[in-house]
UniProtKB/Swiss-Prot annotation:
Compositionally biased spans, kind Basic residues: 71-89
Protein name per the record: Protein BEAN1
Biased composition (Low complexity): 221-230
Top-level taxon: Eukaryota
Region Disordered, residue ranges: 71-91, 152-259
Cellular component, GO annotation: membrane
Known disease link: Spinocerebellar ataxia 31: A form of spinocerebellar ataxia, a clinically and genetically heterogeneous group of cerebellar disorders. Patients show progressive incoordination of gait and often poor coordination of hands, speech and eye movements, due to degeneration of the cerebellum with variable involvement of the brainstem and spinal cord. SCA31 belongs to the autosomal dominant cerebellar ataxias type III (ADCA III) which are characterized by pure cerebellar ataxia without additional signs.
Keyword Signal: no
Protein topology in the membrane: Single-pass membrane protein
Skewed-composition ranges (Polar residues): 171-187
Annotated source species: Homo sapiens (Human)
Subcellular location, record wording: Membrane
Length: 259
């Protein structure tokens, strides 16, 4: 009976079948590692792109904010410069106008200072008693009011005759005078005469009624004086038997003379 001895090569081959070699294990590990590397590479690229996007966005935002700030500063500077220029222009115009007024005033003063004495009107000819020449006044004041000769003189051109009698008045008190006008229809009463008489203690003035004064005809004569126009009014009363004019009583409401 014979026994067969196994071949060591076959045994080696059998064991190599169950236990892979180093080359086979390296090939299997290479196939397992490749997807991990690809995934990590993709993740890294995504992260890098995200960081780049964030950095670029922040830079762009900072640039826009800087441009907007610079634009706002430029606009404010331009507005301030325009406002300052307008204010300077206004001050220049105001100064020019004030300088023009000052120049006009100074030129007027210089003209007045440098003008000769012939340009000035002649001085007033005032006499010792205070009278002023009418011709000088007429030359100096062409629009002056008319004088006495122009109103009541022989060549009167501006005659003015009052249409009604002036109301009664008094410098001290007008109430008794007004009370007396209501009694004008009842004639002259002693009470009214006593009210009209004022004591000299009241400022040194006293009123005298027109009834106590002589008429105009008794003082100046019956005929009108030469150089005066007759005033409208009642005719002088009839003369008495002695040749003296009969005094006519003035109306009770006539004016009072202050003496």
């Amino acid at each position: 009976m014979s026994f067969k001895r196994p071949c060591p090569l076959a045994r080696y081959n059998r064991t190599s079948y169950f236990y892979p070699t180093f080359s086979e294990s390296s090939e299997h590990s290479h196939l397992l590692v490749s997807p991990v590397l690809v995934a990590s590479a993709v993740i890294g690229v995504v992260i890098i792109l995200s960081c780049i996007t964030i950095i670029v966005g922040s830079i762009r935002r900072d640039r826009q904010a800087r441009l907007q700030r610079h634009r706002h500063r430029h606009h404010r500077h331009h507005h301030h410069h325009h406002h300052h220029r307008r204010r300077r222009h206004r001050e220049y115009e105001h100064g020019y106008v004030s300088d023009e007024h000052t120049y006009s005033r100074s030129s007027r003063r210089m003209r007045y200072a440098c003008s000769s004495s012939e340009d000035w009107p002649p001085p007033l000819d005032i006499s010792s008693d205070g009278d002023v020449d009418a011709t000088v006044l007429r030359e100096l004041y062409p629009d002056s009011p008319p004088g006495y000769e122009e109103c009541v003189g022989p060549g009167a051109t501006q005659l003015y005759v009052p249409t009604d009698a002036p109301p009664p008045y008094s410098l001290t008190d007008s109430c008794p005078t007004l009370d007396g006008t209501s009694d004008s229809g009842s004639g002259h009463s002693p009470g009214r005469h006593q009210q009209e008489q004022r004591t000299p203690a009241q400022g040194g003035l006293h009123t005298v009624s027109m009834d106590t004064l002589p008429p105009y005809e008794a003082v100046c004569g019956a005929g009108p004086p030469s150089g005066l126009l007759p005033l409208p009014g009642p005719d002088p009363g009839p003369r008495g038997s002695q040749g003296s004019p009969t005094p006519t009583r003035a109306p009770a409401s006539g004016p009072e003379r202050i003496v």
